[in-house]
Design a protein with these regions (language model features):
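Intein/HINT protein-splicing elements and their conserved insertion hotspots or analogous self-processing inserts
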Residues: 1-7, 11-127, 140-239, 247
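Short helix/loop capping segments that flank catalytic or ligand/cofactor-binding pockets
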Residues: 15-18, 33, 39-45, 95-98, ...
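Solvent-exposed alpha-helices and their adjacent loops that cap or buttress functional pockets
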Residues: 22-26, 39-40, 76-79, 124-129, ...
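Proline-centered loop/turn at the N-terminus of a beta-strand
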Residues: 152, 326-328, 439
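Amide-donor transfer/coupling interface in amidating biosynthetic enzymes
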Residues: 156, 276-278, 319-320, 352-484
Length: 484
């Protein structure tokens, strides 16, 4: 039979004005709003499901107009910077929301009194799935806006620096250990992960997820502002080119990073090189992009590399480019695999390193950190000593390096050498390398997808940066070219 499908989308006016589902230890009070205006009913809830039941009554939204008013008022409070954290009440009920607000940090809990919600049955109160919201306000001034809009709310408690969720309700007191329940919460993901992940690494993820904290060290002189060159429209921009193949992606992110750093960026497809329409003779900086060129048939970047090796014009254009002393390149993800497959990073080695399958034997996608080593890389020189967050997304991201570490110019390593922070098991914990001149960089982490503060899954609290430190890699390339 025909099926009616109704889709809805919500517009986010400003992605820089959002609240995250994690309480701020130094923030204000915690509030609850029941958007449903219905009683606390357990029908259709996760609680009913684990008891092998369905229930008789499920909560509904009794007043659509009130729901709209609450939503719009909360949007205004977010826009005005009055809310520090927030989480909807949905699957699992209020207790799940409260716990999840504490899971994403260490030494974080809350002291709560739910008696003002006027529900004697604590089980119903905690596990009913009435649509609602829990939020943390910057200060008490948010209450004035809520009252002015006729919204019923309850101040239910405050955050704490103890890893315990303490709940009171009409004489009942409950203390819940955050770390223990976070493991319980994560266990379902672990059980599914264990069916997909090789070499017992699902257990490593389960053991390490709470230990591999994202700790950053930003460059001392980084101010978070775009270079004036980003706004220039003159003809003095050095020329850069994006290299891509069928199945490539991230070319727009790479082009944008180059442009913001001051480059005039050209799009170059493999057909341009194969036919001779493009020779790269007027290009000083190339970026081979990420993705799944040729659908990874025969392996990542194998087909792309073959297109260079077995097409005379394309091969000559690339070899001539790398032979010039005034050029730079960056290969990111699939582009890294391409340059490694073509032996462009360590051509002097008799036995070459290669990219191979992740130790997990599956595609890895996540947000991790890298430590920039002491280096002579053109692109990363000013980032030496920094530890930065970055996205990874690859199935064959393992640097398999047959020689001793001193034979390679490893310029960045993952923040931790264990899985999942090191997502692939690379030799020497390698995340990025350059050739011996420092001019040609290969990186499995996607620095071009991590250019903006809002790109990062986690960013240092309190910073209001236009761009992240990764923009310096591209700016350094432009400055070097202007001198050469």
């Amino acid at each position: 039979p025909g099926t009616v499908i109704i889709s809805a989308a919500g517009n986010c006016n400003n992605i820089n004005q959002v609240v995250e589902p994690v309480l701020q230890k130094d923030g204000g009070e915690i509030y609850y709003i029941n958007l449903s205006k219905d009683g606390h009913k357990l029908g259709g809830s996760s609680f009913a499901q684990i008891l092998n039941g369905i229930g008789d009554e499920a909560p509904s939204v009794l007043d659509a107009g009130y729901f709209k008013t609450v939503f719009n008022t909360l949007q205004k409070l977010i826009k005005d910077g009055q809310l520090l954290a927030g989480h909807d009440v949905a699957s699992g009920g209020l207790i799940t929301t409260l716990l999840e607000l504490c899971f994403a940090d260490n030494d974080l809990g809350a002291n709560l009194d739910l008696s003002s919600l006027n529900e004697q049955d604590t089980i119903k109160l905690l596990f009913s799935e009435n649509i609602g919201v829990v939020f943390q306000a910057k200060d008490d001034s948010a209450e004035n806006e809520l009252k002015a809009s006729g919204i019923e709310f309850a101040k239910i408690g405050s955050p704490s620096s103890e890893s315990t969720l303490k709940i009171k309700n009409n004489g009942i007191e409950i203390g819940l250990n955050i770390a223990s329940l976070r493991d319980t919460w994560f266990k379902t993901s672990y059980l599914l992960d264990n069916k997909q992940t090789a070499n017992g690494l699902a257990k490593n993820r389960f053991d390490n997820y709470k230990n591999q904290q994202l700790n950053y060290i930003f460059p001392e002189n980084f101010d978070g502002q775009l270079s004036p060159r980003a706004q220039s429209r003159g003809n003095d921009r050095p020329k850069a080119a994006i290299l891509r193949e069928k199945g490539s992606n991230s070319e727009r992110e790479m082009a944008n990073a180059m442009y913001l750093a001051g480059f005039d960026v050209k799009d170059v497809h493999m057909t341009d090189l194969i036919t001779g329409r493009e020779t790269l003779e007027d290009i000083q900086f190339i970026g081979a992009v990420g993705g799944f060129s040729n659908s990874d048939v025969l392996g990542s970047a194998k087909g792309w590399a073959g297109a260079f090796k077995y097409n005379e014009k394309a091969n000559k254009a690339l070899q001539d480019f790398f032979a010039r002393p005034d050029t730079l390149s960056v290969g990111i993800c699939n582009g890294c695999q391409l340059f490694m497959e073509l032996d462009l990073i360590n051509p002097e080695h008799g036995t070459h390193g290669r990219m191979t399958y992740n130790d997990s034997h599956k595609h890895e996608s996540g947000f991790t950190s890298v430590k920039i080593q002491k280096n002579d890389s053109v692109m990363l020189s000013t980032l030496e000593g920094a530890t930065l967050g970055v996205w990874i997304s690859h199935g064959e991201g393992k640097f398999e390096l047959p020689l001793s570490e001193k034979e390679y110019n490893i310029v960045a390593k993952y923040g931790y050498d264990a899985y999942p922070a090191n997502p692939n098991g690379s030799s020497y914990n390698t995340a990025m390398m350059t050739d011996k001149t420092g001019r040609h960089l290969v990186t499995m982490p996607h620095i071009e997808r991590s250019i903006f503060q809002w790109n990062w899954a986690n960013y240092p609290k309190g910073r209001k940066d236009e761009v992240s430190p990764w923009i310096e890699a591209f700016e350094n390339a432009r400055k070097w070219i202007e001198k050469h």
